[in-house]
Design a protein with these regions (language model features):
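Short amphipathic alpha-helical coupling elements at transmembrane boundaries
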Residues: 69-73, 152
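Cytosolic regulatory regions of ion transport systems
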Residues: 2-35, 45-65, 78-606, 615-641
Length: 641
């Protein structure tokens, strides 16, 4: 008996604390049960029954049958006055039970259902069967700006935006409220759930979505692992769907090592059968923003970053680009590597001594250099580098030779790295920066990438006066707000250019990812041109439809996709180097030949930075002797001739 009581109580409590329909089911079950008991008991009493004569009479009242009389008493107490005197005590019992069940419990349950519905909506517990919607999994500082971009982009129309997060729904709505107007705010749906549960992920209806952004939560220690695990579960859901198109998935990886692994190896090959997989990294994203798209924000608050080659580095030019990065933080390394992909110019084809230079300054440069050389070991197998110790009064220089190759097989790259150990605020390094400013042979840019934003601000504003007097661009990393630097670098037409007009903020946490797909489309077009040229021997005269570009793109390995993307990123610097700044024009044969050599130099750097290595002489013989061996070396050993 006790067991049955416990089971009944447990089931009752679970039902009444759950969804509203369960409460209604219980209530109607009780009502039906009570009414059936009343109906059975009523047979102990004589109820007036209608006769055939009474049914056919026109002006006579027609008495109701037993069942209908009981129903009327049960739901309306006023009907008790019509009951014969000998039934009034029984009728009173029926009326009281009806009052309790209908006027008491039913109204309470319905009111509770409405209150619970409102509460569940506020807490983000209601699931809606959406379709053609945008899904954002996770919530951090960049999500409100991402939503703003989606709402401003006519490509997305007025589709709903579903946000799944473990954070309180009210907190999410309040943060989004500051970015959106009332009309777009109605498009937001918040669902409080975890991204490591298949059951919770199925509620997102990703198989019917238009696009998915897997961002993750803020301040997670195992952010990348959770995102990968979440993506695996979503792919499993899509595998079970027979008619599911390839939906774009943009996935944030916090650590550059994770991001680099997905750039080189086809870890996502199985996933890409069911989804369009697009990884991105916060630091790589900001490096691309300031070096490739060169724009942050829109409207009056738009910041346009100057190119590193703000002077055309032509074939005849004697100048080289010099990028100085203060602080070997993750942001600093990302900017340095992105710059190495871009800084390739025609004058190196004429004079092999004119190379682009990327200099890192850090008080722990000796240790950070070892990490950097280990991560990009295949670059340093070929290229030499300079290391300077300026941490003390005396300056010590060390020339580091290539670790594997020498002679004609070494130092043929057109970009070199330098490492300086010391603090940028010391007099020795301040004087060195002055020398660089007044060196007419270089085009200088400085990026301050310290981890502590106030320290970055101080460093960016207290460089030698020569930096500001000569209008050298200074990029200063910030995290939360760029308001002060936006005011300092204001260059409206009605204002004179002042001391800090060439100091630019970057690295804000709320704005990293750009929805602009221009570079991706350019990469797809480059791939199409390569394929067309290989198949037919000439260049296509027109661009195919987007679906044809996508189909060809999705067949590529990840490393080849990134190769085409980096080639697309370098289009603007290449065109500037031959004097073209406005639009696209037809090139002559000499320009094509020159840019092809520049592209080959860029391609060499790209392969080394992505993780491929140069083969030895013995390996080259095997590679060129057999196509099968060549494929093995490229795809399994990451050796590229």
């Amino acid at each position: 008996m006790n067991l049955l009581t416990r089971l009944f109580a447990l089931h009752f409590d679970r039902s009444f604390s759950g969804k509203g329909w369960r409460q209604l089911a219980w209530l109607f079950g009780v009502i039906v049960t009570v009414f059936l008991l009343i109906y059975l008991v009523s047979f102990a009493f004589i109820f007036p029954e209608p006769s055939l004569e009474e049914w056919t009479g026109i002006d006579k009242d027609v008495p109701m049958g037993r069942l209908l009389q009981l129903i009327c008493l049960f739901i309306d107490p006023g009907n008790i006055v019509e009951v014969p005197p000998y039934l009034r005590w029984f009728s009173l019992l029926v009326v009281v039970l009806g009052l309790i069940l209908f006027c008491g419990l039913l109204i309470s349950v319905i009111s509770n259902m409405l209150e619970r519905r409102v509460e569940r909506y506020r807490e983000g517990d209601i699931v809606y069967p959406l379709q053609n919607h945008i899904v954002i999994i996770g919530f951090d500082n960049m999500v409100p700006t991402l939503i703003q971009q989606i709402c401003d982009d006519t490509h997305y129309g007025n589709c709903h935006i579903l946000i799944q997060s473990t954070q309180p729904a009210q907190e999410i709505r309040s943060k989004i409220h500051t970015e959106l107007d009332a009309k777009n705010e109605k498009r937001i749906v918040v669902l409080r759930a975890r991204r490591d549960s298949i059951e919770e992920l199925e509620k997102l209806y990703t198989t019917k979505a238009r696009e998915v952004f897997l961002i993750g939560e803020r301040n997670e220690h195992d952010h990348d692992s959770l995102n990968i695990d979440c993506l695996k579960k979503i792919v499993d859901i899509h595998k079970r769907c027979n008619k599911c198109s390839l939906i774009p998935f943009t996935v944030l990886f916090e650590y550059q090592t994770t991001f680099a692994a997905f750039q080189l190896t086809d870890l996502s090959a199985e996933w890409r059968k069911y989804i369009e997989f697009h990884p991105f990294n916060f630091y790589e994203g900001w490096a691309k923003k300031i070096l490739v798209s060169r724009q942050y924000g829109k409207g009056e608050n738009c910041i346009e970053y100057p190119p590193l080659d703000r002077e055309a580095i032509t074939y005849e030019s004697e100048k080289h680009v010099h990028l100085v990065i203060i602080g070997m933080s993750r942001m600093g390394v990302a900017i340095g590597v992105e710059a190495a992909h871009l800084l390739h110019f025609p004058n190196f084809c004429r004079d092999k001594n004119i190379k682009s230079v990327i200099t890192f300054i850090d008080e722990n440069a000796d240790r950070e250099m070892n990490f950097f050389c280990g991560r990009y070991r295949h670059y340093f197998e070929i290229s030499s580098t300079h290391y300077y110790d300026m941490s003390k009064d005396e300056r010590h220089e060390r020339f580091v030779l290539p670790t594997r190759f020498k002679g004609k097989d070494a130092d043929f790259l057109d970009v070199e790295f330098e490492f300086i150990k010391g603090r940028a605020e010391t007099p020795a390094i301040q004087n060195l920066i002055k020398e660089w400013v007044h060196d007419s042979g270089q085009v200088l840019t400085i990026a301050v990438c310290l981890n502590y934003p106030p320290q970055s601000m101080a460093m960016g504003l207290y460089l030698p006066d020569d930096v500001y007097d000569e209008n050298i661009p200074v990029f200063v990393r910030q995290e939360t707000s760029s308001a002060l630097l936006n005011m300092l670098n204001s260059k409206k037409k009605d204002e004179a250019i002042h001391k800090y007009s060439h100091v630019f903020p970057f690295g804000m946490l709320d704005n990293c990812y750009d929805l602009d797909k221009k570079s991706r489309r350019e990469g797809q077009i480059i791939n199409y041109i390569y394929d067309f040229k290989n198949k037919y021997g000439n260049v296509p005269q027109s661009c195919p439809p987007d679906n044809e570009l996508k189909d060809s793109w999705n067949k590529l390995s990840v490393s080849l996709q990134w190769s085409n993307l980096y080639s697309a990123y370098s289009i603007s610097p290449k065109l500037r180097s031959i004097g073209i700044t406005d639009g696209y024009v037809k090139l002559d044969n000499d320009q094509i030949t020159l840019l092809a050599e520049v592209e080959h130099n860029r391609w060499n750097m790209e392969k080394l930075l992505l993780g491929f290595r140069k083969p030895t002489a013995e390996e080259e013989e095997l590679i060129y002797g057999s196509k099968e061996m060549g494929d093995i070396f490229k795809k399994k050993r990451f050796v590229h001739p």
